Design a protein with these regions (language model features):
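The alpha-helix within a helix-turn-helix
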Residues: 23, 34, 65
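Short C-terminal boundary/hinge segments that cap the last helix of small helical domains
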Residues: 69-81
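Residues within the helices of the helix-turn-helix
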Residues: 20, 31, 62
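A short, Lys/Arg-rich alpha-helix, primarily the initiator
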Residues: 2-25
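Short alpha-helical DNA-recognition segment
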Residues: 27-47
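Residue-level signal for the short linker/turn that defines the boundary of a DNA-recognition helix
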Residues: 17, 27-28, 56-59
């Protein structure tokens, strides 16, 4: 079970890094992403933060992918992060 939790944490970290990467590629600040997505600035900070426990939903990933103009698949991509 412990290994499974680590694997899940790794997936969340990959997604978080990709959200940050694509946000920056779109020349957006965390505040810009918050405003365009409807999430709070604090929530976006938590999503992107490397040290917090991740628990955002597939719906959140979908919504952020639409704002960032990328596919959900791109947010799960481990290469180039």
């Amino acid at each position: 079970m412990q290994r499974r939790n680590k694997d899940l944490t790794d997936v969340y970290l990959i997604i978080a890094k990709n959200i940050k990467k694509y946000r920056r590629k779109n020349n957006m600040t965390q505040l810009d992403l918050a405003k365009k997505s409807g999430y709070s600035y604090a929530y976006i900070r938590r999503v992107e933060g490397p040290s917090c426990i991740k628990n955002f939903s597939i719906q959140t990933i979908y919504n952020l992918s639409k704002v960032l103009n990328v596919s959900i698949k791109q947010l799960f991509d481990e290469s180039d992060i």
